[in-house]
């Protein structure tokens, strides 16, 4: 799995998990998200950038993505939408699925 990710996804080409860690697809996806965000000039690297896995539920495992833009609020909304569109397009490469729950 990891070799495939390294070959197909340039941002993961040099990824080496910690010793004694068997990486999962969700772990590698979180690494990808962090690397992707740090590669974007619109993301403010001087402020917090956090990608965390939240408590799993009967619907799945939520991932929280927290970052700041270098732009004003109105532009942030567009930037955020573009970034999430990119993540939605990349998720199948990690053999993951998006699930939306609504009442």
Task: Locate each region found by the language model.
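Structured, soluble regulatory/oligomerization domains located on the cytosolic or IMS-facing side
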Residues: 1-103
